[in-house]
């Protein structure tokens, strides 16, 4: 996948040079380019913002540098242009899966009080991280890009690595443990030490269902329980 990020602060995306995403870039599963919108302004003072017509607080990003940067990137990247803004569709795991199927994407990070409405003509989709205020689109873009890239073939090494994670299948993840087997008097559940893979799988599914119902009842309500799920829960409750 190729991703181009249009931003006023390209240095913020150096985080992608590290950890899982950094290795994916090194191994050429992924390419992430940052484009400084300021490089495209025709303003002699390199300004990319101005006061809003009609008055009001704050500044608005001008259409010209945004549009010109999009047009330039579009010469090589034919992907959807995605703007990170409050009016967009709320990002979730389903949307991450959808976008992970694309070969190319372009992300536009806004700043100040927003962008000139005329720039929207060049935007294909708007995405919001949630109902709260951030300093700029960069803050939303980083976790969104990370979430998408984790789903790409080869990035995590195994599909099981992300299929077991919270939200992937509509449920929160089961509890995890590592050595030592006993810490401060608290022991790891015996089933995890048993080596019985089928029982471990059932325990994890039961805990995932129970935790989701307790912590995120909204997610649990959307999840369609299978007959196998019901049996796993029934058997789990019998052992309590």
Swiss-Prot record:
<dbReference type="InterPro" id="IPR023148">
    <property type="entry name" value="tRNA_m1G_MeTrfase_C_sf"/>
</dbReference>
<comment type="function">
    <text>Specifically methylates guanosine-37 in various tRNAs.</text>
</comment>
<dbReference type="InterPro" id="IPR016009">
    <property type="entry name" value="tRNA_MeTrfase_TRMD/TRM10"/>
</dbReference>
<comment type="subunit">
    <text>Homodimer.</text>
</comment>
<comment type="similarity">
    <text>Belongs to the RNA methyltransferase TrmD family.</text>
</comment>
<dbReference type="GO" id="GO:0002939">
    <property type="term" value="P:tRNA N1-guanine methylation"/>
</dbReference>
<keyword id="KW-0819">tRNA processing</keyword>
<keyword id="KW-0963">Cytoplasm</keyword>
<feature type="binding site">
    <location>
        <begin position="129"/>
        <end position="134"/>
    </location>
    <ligand>
        <name>S-adenosyl-L-methionine</name>
    </ligand>
</feature>
<dbReference type="GO" id="GO:0005829">
    <property type="term" value="C:cytosol"/>
</dbReference>
<dbReference type="InterPro" id="IPR029026">
    <property type="entry name" value="tRNA_m1G_MTases_N"/>
</dbReference>
<keyword id="KW-0949">S-adenosyl-L-methionine</keyword>
<dbReference type="Pfam" id="PF01746">
    <property type="entry name" value="tRNA_m1G_MT"/>
</dbReference>
<dbReference type="InterPro" id="IPR029028">
    <property type="entry name" value="Alpha/beta_knot_MTases"/>
</dbReference>
<dbReference type="InterPro" id="IPR002649">
    <property type="entry name" value="tRNA_m1G_MeTrfase_TrmD"/>
</dbReference>
<keyword id="KW-0489">Methyltransferase</keyword>
<feature type="binding site">
    <location>
        <position position="110"/>
    </location>
    <ligand>
        <name>S-adenosyl-L-methionine</name>
    </ligand>
</feature>
<keyword id="KW-0808">Transferase</keyword>
<dbReference type="GO" id="GO:0052906">
    <property type="term" value="F:tRNA (guanine(37)-N1)-methyltransferase activity"/>
</dbReference>
<protein>
    <recommendedName>
        <fullName>tRNA (guanine-N(1)-)-methyltransferase</fullName>
        <ecNumber>2.1.1.228</ecNumber>
    </recommendedName>
</protein>
């Amino acid at each position: 996948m190729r991703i181009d990020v249009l931003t006023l602060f390209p240095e913020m995306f150096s985080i992608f040079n590290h950890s899982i995403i950094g290795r994916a870039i090194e191994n050429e599963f992924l390419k992430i380019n940052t484009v400084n919108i300021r490089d495209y302004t025709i303003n002699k003072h390199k300004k990319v913002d101005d006061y809003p017509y009609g008055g009001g607080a704050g500044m608005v990003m001008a259409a010209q540098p945004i549009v010109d940067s999009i047009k330039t990137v579009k010469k090589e990247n034919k992907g959807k242009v995605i703007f990170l803004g409050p009016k967009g569709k709320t990002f979730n795991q389903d949307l991450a899966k959808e976008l992970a199927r694309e070969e190319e994407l372009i992300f536009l990070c806004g700043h100040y009080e927003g962008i000139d409405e005329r720039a929207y003509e060049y935007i294909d989709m708007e995405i919001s991280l949630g109902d709260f205020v951030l300093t700029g689109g960069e803050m939303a873009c980083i976790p969104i890009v990370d979430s998408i890239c984790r789903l790409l073939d080869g990035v995590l090494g195994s599909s099981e690595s992300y299929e077991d994670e919270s939200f992937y299948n509509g449920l929160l993840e089961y509890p995890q443990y590592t050595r030592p087997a006993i810490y401060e008097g608290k022991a790891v559940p015996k089933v995890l030490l048993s080596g019985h893979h089928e029982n471990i799988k059932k325990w994890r599914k039961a805990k995932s269902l129970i935790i989701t119902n307790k912590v995120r009842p909204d997610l649990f309500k959307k999840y369609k329980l299978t007959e196998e799920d019901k049996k796993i829960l029934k058997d789990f409750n019998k052992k309590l």
